């Protein structure tokens, strides 16, 4: 039963294990994998990163037998998949726990972990984007960066990036809150309460049945059951939009920073020439910094963000339409929060 509790303990917000793990393995998981040879990602390196994440996080306070049972598993990759798509944590069980945790149950735990992992990856991605986009970075670009019409257009695109990131973060946070506080914790508390009340009279069969009911509750309420497959695909499209936004934003900010760096170098040369009584501005240089990024680049960046923003909103609209149809579970509070966030301006 302690293995079941680990699902929530590892995932809960106040824990730092998942964040420490993602910090240490994101470079490895960004690599593409050959579907035939599985080359491109090292399970040995991932295992070392897992051990390091345990040591530097609150996971080190867990019982030693729990830490020893935690391992890394790589699922079979498909075409164009990266390490993020095949990585999974594995809890290796020994008898007599295997009596309760059969291969079927462990497969369902794996499905739940994969979903939670995708949620946490989306949250981690959006937090990393905030570090790249935070106001101090934007103000530095404005102070040292590009002038003229191109500079103004880039400021508009930076502001739009902040708005899109905020919308994505709001949705991911609401879904995480639902999974944590309306699915995992109440399902576990109910299971634990039944075990403690019937501890003296329960036989093995009743424990197995209680655990199966608990797992059924988690799978269904987390929208991972057969009745929620369409909704789950809709949520996966939202996850994909987050990763597309990450790629777009990092490319945009890297280009702006590179242009800013070149401009600063040119500005130093201009000052040196003027001090030596030479022409300050040479061919291809601009004191306003208008020529370091082309209008085509700015137009392309705007069109790319338009596409990502429209795609994300389309997927959110689809998700909101499907959510009330999940009559087998109570998603009313999640629907209310999302409607308040995404429909108030409609």
Q: Which residues does each predicted region cover?
A:
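Extended amphipathic alpha-helical elements
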Residues: 54, 74-78, 88, 95-107, ...
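Intrinsically disordered, proline- and charge-rich regulatory regions
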Residues: 112, 169, 176-178, 199-346
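Extended amphipathic alpha-helical scaffold segments
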Residues: 9, 100-129, 155-203
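Charge-rich, solvent-exposed alpha-helical interaction surfaces
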Residues: 20-24, 28, 32, 49, ...
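Single conserved hydrophobic/aromatic residue that forms the stacking wall/gate
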Residues: 2-7, 11
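Amphipathic alpha-helical scaffolding segments
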Residues: 130-141, 184-192, 236-237, 256-271
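Long, K/E/R/D-enriched contiguous segments that form extended
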Residues: 137-152, 157
């Amino acid at each position: 039963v302690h293995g079941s509790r680990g699902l929530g303990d590892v995932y809960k917000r106040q824990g730092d294990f998942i964040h420490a793990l993602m910090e240490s393995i994101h470079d490895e998981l960004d690599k593409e994998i050959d579907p035939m040879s599985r080359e491109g990602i090292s399970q040995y390196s991932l295992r070392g990163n897992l051990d390091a994440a345990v040591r530097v996080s609150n996971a080190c306070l867990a019982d030693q037998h729990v830490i020893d049972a935690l391992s890394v598993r790589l699922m079979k990759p498909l075409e164009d998949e990266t390490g993020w798509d095949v990585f999974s944590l594995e809890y290796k069980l020994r008898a007599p726990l295997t009596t309760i945790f059969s291969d079927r149950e462990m497969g369902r735990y794996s499905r739940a972990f994969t979903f939670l992992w995708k949620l946490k990856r989306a949250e981690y991605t959006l937090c990393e984007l905030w570090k790249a986009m935070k106001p101090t970075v934007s103000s530095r670009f404005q102070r040292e960066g590009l002038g003229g019409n191109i500079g103004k257009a880039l400021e508009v695109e930076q502001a739009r990036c902040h708005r899109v990131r905020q919308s994505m973060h709001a949705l991911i946070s609401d879904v995480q809150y639902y999974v944590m506080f309306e699915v995992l914790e109440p399902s576990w508390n109910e299971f634990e309460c039944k075990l403690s009340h019937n501890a003296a009279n329960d036989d093995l069969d009743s424990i197995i049945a209680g655990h199966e009911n608990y797992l059924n509750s988690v799978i269904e309420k987390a929208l991972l059951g057969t009745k929620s497959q369409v909704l789950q695909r809709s949520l996966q499209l939202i996850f994909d939009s987050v990763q597309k936004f990450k790629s777009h934003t990092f490319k945009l900010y890297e280009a702006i920073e590179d242009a800013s760096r070149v401009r600063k170098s040119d500005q130093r040369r201009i000052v040196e020439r003027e001090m030596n009584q030479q022409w300050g501005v040479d061919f291809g240089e601009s004191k306003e910094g208008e020529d370091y990024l082309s209008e085509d680049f700015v137009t392309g960046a705007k069109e790319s963000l338009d596409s990502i923003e429209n795609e994300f909103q389309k997927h959110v609209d689809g998700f909101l339409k499907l959510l009330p149809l999940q009559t087998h579970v109570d998603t009313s509070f999640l629907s209310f929060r999302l409607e308040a966030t995404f429909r108030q301006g409609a």
